[in-house]
From Swiss-Prot:
Its main location: membrane. The modification Phosphothreonine is found at residues 222, 346. On T-cell activation, phosphorylation by the JNK cascade on serine and threonine residues surrounding the PRR domain accelerates the ubiquitination and degradation of JUN and JUNB. The increased ITCH catalytic activity due to phosphorylation by JNK1 may occur due to a conformational change disrupting the interaction between the PRR/WW motifs domain and the HECT domain and, thus exposing the HECT domain. Phosphorylation by FYN reduces interaction with JUNB and negatively controls JUN ubiquitination and degradation. Residues 535-544 are annotated as: MAP kinase docking site. Residues 1-115 form the C2 domain. Acts as an E3 ubiquitin-protein ligase which accepts ubiquitin from an E2 ubiquitin-conjugating enzyme in the form of a thioester and then directly transfers the ubiquitin to targeted substrates. It catalyzes 'Lys-29'-, 'Lys-48'- and 'Lys-63'-linked ubiquitin conjugation. Involved in the control of inflammatory signaling pathways. Is an essential component of a ubiquitin-editing protein complex, comprising also TNFAIP3, TAX1BP1 and RNF11, that ensures the transient nature of inflammatory signaling pathways. Promotes the association of the complex after TNF stimulation. This is E3 ubiquitin-protein ligase Itchy. The WW domains mediate interaction with PPxY motif-containing proteins. The lineage of its organism: Eukaryota, Metazoa, Chordata, Craniata, Vertebrata. Residues 165-174 have a biased composition (Basic and acidic residues). Residues 151-164 have a biased composition (Polar residues). Monomer. Part of a ternary complex composed of SMAD3, ITCH/AIP4 and NEDD9/HEF1; within the complex NEDD9/HEF1 interacts (via N-terminus) with ITCH/AIP4 (via WW domains); the complex mediates ubiquitination and proteasomal degradation of NEDD9/HEF1. Interacts (via WW domains) with OCNL. Interacts (via WW domains) with NOTCH1. Interacts (via WW domains) JUN. Interacts with JUNB; the interaction promotes ITCH-mediated ubiquitination and degradation of JUNB. Interacts with FYN; the interaction phosphorylates ITCH on Tyr-381 decreasing binding of JUNB. It comes from Mus musculus (Mouse). Residues 151-294 are annotated as: Disordered. It is a peripheral membrane protein.
Amino acid sequence: MSDSGPQLDSMGSLTMKSQLQITVISAKLKENKKNWFGPSPYVEVTVDGQSKKTEKCNNTNSPKWKQPLTVIVTPTSKLCFRVWSHQTLKSDVLLGTAGLDIYETLKSNNMKLEEVVMTLQLVGDKEPTETMGDLSVCLDGLQVEAEVVTNGETSCSESTTQNDDGCRTRDDTRVSTNGSEDPEVAASGENKRANGNNSPSLSNGGFKPSRPPRPSRPPPPTPRRPASVNGSPSTNSDSDGSSTGSLPPTNTNVNTSTSEGATSGLIIPLTISGGSGPRPLNTVSQAPLPPGWEQRVDQHGRVYYVDHVEKRTTWDRPEPLPPGWERRVDNMGRIYYVDHFTRTTTWQRPTLESVRNYEQWQLQRSQLQGAMQQFNQRFIYGNQDLFATSQNKEFDPLGPLPPGWEKRTDSNGRVYFVNHNTRITQWEDPRSQGQLNEKPLPEGWEMRFTVDGIPYFVDHNRRATTYIDPRTGKSALDNGPQIAYVRDFKAKVQYFRFWCQQLAMPQHIKITVTRKTLFEDSFQQIMSFSPQDLRRRLWVIFPGEEGLDYGGVAREWFFLLSHEVLNPMYCLFEYAGKDNYCLQINPASYINPDHLKYFRFIGRFIAMALFHGKFIDTGFSLPFYKRILNKPVGLKDLESIDPEFYNSLIWVKENNIEECGLEMYFSVDKEILGEIKSHDLKPNGGNILVTEENKEEYIRMVAEWRLSRGVEEQTQAFFEGFNEILPQQYLQYFDAKELEVLLCGMQEIDLNDWQRHAIYRHYTRTSKQIMWFWQFVKEIDNEKRMRLLQFVTGTCRLPVGGFADLMGSNGPQKFCIEKVGKENWLPRSHTCFNRLDLPPYKSYEQLKEKLLFAIEETEGFGQE
């Protein structure tokens, strides 16, 4: 009994806490050839449940931080260093780990850690024998008296056995997610040290902190559920020092007196007297605990909480339920929670923070849907104006049909052509068919187009150009229908598809992406293929889904990926205006150090959409389409981007600025991320005054600057990727609005056109299920119609010709409704064939419920 006092005093000295400053200097990491851009490493330091992180260094294998981190340690603590690589769109990757024993480091440095620089070897997480690099750190601010070492080595060796593997493995059963011990493990270890016979005798005050400790300690993580929480958990108080460790004992004599240091909020070394429990920490007054909860203190002085209702413990202080929530118990004794506002239930206990985050997510989702709906409406008028000419029956831009040909319309409203000379019919227009099936040019010849769309021919052998076609000997200037042909939009599309077929490569490529990391997976795969491979047929695979890609999966991939890459939240693009939800390049995209690589990737992706005839979810501004077409932008293009700035330039153009006394110079200011910079429109423009004579030049230059300010590098990177897949000259006979429709499709859903061009299998137009279906389509709003269209066809965009020109895996494929299944089945879709499997429901309400559930909740491919 006489030896117990000194032993406990010695352990109190060894468990006394002090600050340690760790300066993470630099690292030398092993290169990974699979990572093109290099890792973005940062260091996480964990010790005794604490976790501190450094800033990240972008794209380097030799990072330098020189960042100080302060932690609370004891002489028996063990530091764990983890080097992570930050990932933008997925979880961070662990590059290597290293451990450091403070006790051994103190012994090797004369019990003082004052600016001690150490180089630690990083090892792999899965293979500890693999060297991943070196990490340099500096330790400072810790000092221990020498008598602690001479008298306390045995206690140190015993007490440090708790965390020997805490750094080598991430799933240690005795260490929680951030390194803190469970309450039962801590209690068991403390009893062994306090009551064991091998505890050495130490003098008081052996461990002295060289710096004042921190005023508070971060809360420990949630422990495992204890074996018993009814009342005070049972503990074994035998003389051999064993303990059950189910929970920290609560029937011990706890000294609740506070010293002068405790009142100031400092951490006090634990004083154990006669086997009694530790002194609890002086906690700040908080809100009362919910009913059924109790606050306790374990033998390390750590506060934990007991839920007597659910019979569990946790380190986190419980919060009361948010307003409107109620806790209930079902017939099997399971606890669930009821939200009386939304009339929903959940197994997970809600918190104020989780409810607030959910409400914020709902608000952002509704705002995004509203923005997209406004964007969709923007294209309705444009399409009507675009096709006004093609709907004029008195004017045919292709000219008259060849002799012996006749144009007819079938019962479904589709146009076909009759050749009375050979008595055959065909869908293709003979005027465009002959132009698409021309003979190949001689070797060394190339056909190009002027700005007006007139074809001319380049003889690379003699380095000459001519309008005369070397195949026919006729001049392209004399071919009137050819010029009219390139001015008709539908014919332009056919001609463009013809050239895409000429550039296409045989076979196909597989693109495997997951929905959770769609952006990053698509970026890695598209940039890993050569441009020629990306011209092959695309075979998109979503792992875990049974869909076979006959065109429908690729359509959804383009739709989903375009929604991701063009999201303004990534700071690569921004909305063109407050009320204009078209996109343009964000001048502040440089805050992402890899933004030029992403713009090259987006250029490839947009060109792939045009090349493969797929649609994207979001469109660009008209000036950006002009840049794709290599057409100049001017003052008129500024009106759709910045109306206020446009009106001010119009005022300058129409008024005498000299009479108004305006002092303007050939210099403008721009603000990016709060920083204002001056830009000269011409050399020494800050000293050149704008006058009536040169204001036209000023207006032209300032309009060009406004449309291209700060995005020159991004635009160049975009076109580098774009031209690798599809050279821009193949688009030069389109205008900006036509290119917009070609890339995004038509936005207006014509119900009459939809119903007129639908076909049925095992149903008829008069079947009650079909009549109910069209009644349902008429009742829902425009947004749900688009979702229904996306559910069946894979995209909410329509081709140029509307529902009559819907394409499937085998060519033209109309919207089809087939009678399949039983009345208790959900509708299924076959996006590759534009087919909806509609079971024979018994009532309209049942059909409406099943269809709404299908289009709202279904995601992925599970079709045959």
